[in-house]
């Protein structure tokens, strides 16, 4: 049997592409060459949006029947920061002391490399065809505005008649060690700006003004003090976090006309975006009474809450993890948002990849042994899925 590329070699090829969003820098070419060589039909699709950069995306599929397992992810990376601070070049793909260094090693070129390596090995051992379909849905627009990537690629695929049964997103889901966590959902995210209007005036004549600063402080305290909920079966309690307070006033002898406070809410499945906004607005109105003039400017958000209920698919992935690592993974919904929120509208989706401890950091790195383990886990998923 012909040997197939290792996850390490694929990851190194990807890391050597400096694909800081929106640049692709050849990363999708690496995947296209490998997948075409294994018999996949590969599509490259570019999406545009006014005011944003054009983004190249890749969709590849082999097989045309169900069940259909999709591997999803992104080849774009965040900027490396101070290049001189890296022990090894951010885009060199160096291995030292058993560790693979590079921007994207963990988030998430390493995970993509493992999925590709596992798939190529599975196909080579099974006559070149799955008993169903395998696809790769890869974007170059996840780390920035995320408007010309996965969300549009899914719409494009649906318009072509593509139907997914299950999906694994190779985001770095593990906290401490390979196999400790499967992400089965994510909280929603909604940001806003609390605005309190006052009346500008001289600090020596406060009776002629209305200071919004004490009022916004009271409102911040009120909105922070009462929990939005107490959590649910799969999620921790929703959390409202104020992140800045601004009055735009450089003077010390002028009462400002307005005060603004930015905030973000990470919310669970007790809420939708609309019911959440209504709840916060209701509490704000009660706190303002008839005296304080305040309102909220809600910022656009496409980060809805989602959860894949534990069941046959999570059990299958968990069994593959246990076989390789001996661990029973925790089913978790913590952390920030990811493109899985878009995929959840089309099929059941979980996130399982490498350990996330060094993602976005200087000297981002992963043990080569973790690449081998993750490849073996994905290989076990494929074997079980198409049994």
From Swiss-Prot:
Gene Ontology terms describing biological process: diaminopimelate biosynthetic process; L-arginine biosynthetic process; lysine biosynthetic process via diaminopimelate
Q: What superkingdom heads the lineage?
A: Bacteria
EC assignment: 3.5.1.18
So where's the catalytic machinery, residue-wise? Answer: 76, 142
Q: Which UniProt keywords apply?
A: Amino-acid biosynthesis, Cobalt, Diaminopimelate biosynthesis, Hydrolase, Lysine biosynthesis, Metal-binding, Zinc
- Read off the InterPro entries from this record: Bact_exopeptidase_dim_dom (IPR036264), DapE_proteobac (IPR005941), Peptidase_M20 (IPR002933), Peptidase_M20_dimer (IPR011650), Peptidase_M20A (IPR050072)
Gene3D superfamilies xref list: Zn peptidases
Q: Tell me the disulfide pairings in this chain.
A: none
Q: Which residues bind Zn(2+) 2?
A: 107, 143, 360
What this protein needs as a cofactor is:
Zn(2+); Co(2+)
Q: How is the cofactor bound?
A: Binds 2 Zn(2+) or Co(2+) ions per subunit.
Catalytic activity of the protein: N-succinyl-(2S,6S)-2,6-diaminopimelate + H2O = (2S,6S)-2,6-diaminopimelate + succinate
- Binding locations of Zn(2+) 1: 74, 107, 171
Q: What Pfam families does the record tag this protein with? A: M20_dimer (PF07687), Peptidase_M20 (PF01546)
State the top-level EC class.
hydrolase
Q: GO MF terms on file?
A: acetylornithine deacetylase activity; cobalt ion binding; succinyl-diaminopimelate desuccinylase activity; zinc ion binding
State the pathway, as annotated in the record.
Amino-acid biosynthesis; L-lysine biosynthesis via DAP pathway; LL-2,6-diaminopimelate from (S)-tetrahydrodipicolinate (succinylase route): step 3/3
What does this gene product do? Catalyzes the hydrolysis of N-succinyl-L,L-diaminopimelic acid (SDAP), forming succinate and LL-2,6-diaminopimelate (DAP), an intermediate involved in the bacterial biosynthesis of lysine and meso-diaminopimelic acid, an essential component of bacterial cell walls.
Subunit note: Homodimer.
**Family statement drawn from the similarity comment of this UniProt entry:** Belongs to the peptidase M20A family. DapE subfamily.
What this protein is called in its record is: Succinyl-diaminopimelate desuccinylase
Q: Which organism is it from?
A: Rhodopseudomonas palustris (strain TIE-1)
């Amino acid at each position: 049997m012909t040997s197939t590329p290792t996850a390490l070699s694929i990851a190194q090829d990807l890391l050597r592409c400096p694909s800081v969003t929106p640049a692709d820098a050849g990363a999708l070419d690496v995947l296209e060459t490998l997948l075409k060589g294994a018999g996949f039909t590969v599509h490259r699709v570019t999406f545009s949006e006014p005011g944003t950069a054009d983004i190249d995306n890749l969709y590849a599929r082999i097989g045309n029947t169900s069940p259909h397992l999709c591997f999803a992810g992104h080849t774009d990376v965040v900027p490396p920061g101070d290049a001189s601070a890296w022990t090894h070049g951010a885009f060199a793909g160096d291995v030292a002391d058993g560790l693979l260094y590079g921007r994207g090693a963990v988030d998430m070129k390493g995970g993509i490399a493992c999925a590709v390596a596992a798939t190529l090995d599975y196909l080579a051992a099974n006559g070149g065809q799955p008993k169903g379909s395998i696809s790769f849905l890869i974007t170059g627009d996840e780390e920035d505005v995320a408007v010309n990537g996965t969300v549009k690629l899914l719409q494009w695929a649906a318009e072509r008649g593509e139907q997914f049964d299950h999906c694994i997103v190779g985001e770095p889901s593990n906290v401490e060690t390979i196999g400790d966590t499967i992400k089965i959902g994510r909280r929603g995210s909604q940001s806003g700006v609390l605005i309190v209007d006052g009346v500008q005036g001289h600090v020596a004549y406060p009776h002629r003004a209305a200071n919004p600063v004490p009022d916004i402080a009271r409102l911040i305290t009120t909105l922070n003090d009462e929990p939005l909920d107490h959590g649910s079966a799969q999620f921790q309690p929703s959390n409202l976090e104020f992140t800045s307070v601004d009055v735009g006033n450089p003077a010390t002898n002028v009462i400002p006309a307005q005060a603004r406070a930015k905030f973000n809410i990470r919310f669970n499945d007790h809420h939708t975006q609309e019911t959440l906004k209504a709840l916060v607005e209701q509490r704000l109105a009660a706190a303002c009474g008839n005296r304080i003039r305040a309102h909220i400017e809600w910022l656009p958000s496409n980060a809805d809450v989602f959860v894949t209920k534990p069941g046959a698919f999570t059990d299958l992935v968990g069994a593959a993890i246990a076989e390789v690592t001996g661990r029973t993974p925790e089913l978790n919904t913590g952390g920030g948002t990811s493109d899985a929120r878009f995929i959840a509208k089309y099929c059941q989706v979980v996130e399982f990849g490498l350990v996330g401890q060094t993602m976005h950091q200087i000297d981002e790195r992963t043990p080569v042994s973790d690449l081998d383990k993750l490849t073996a886990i994905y290989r076990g998923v494929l074997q079980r899925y198409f049994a």
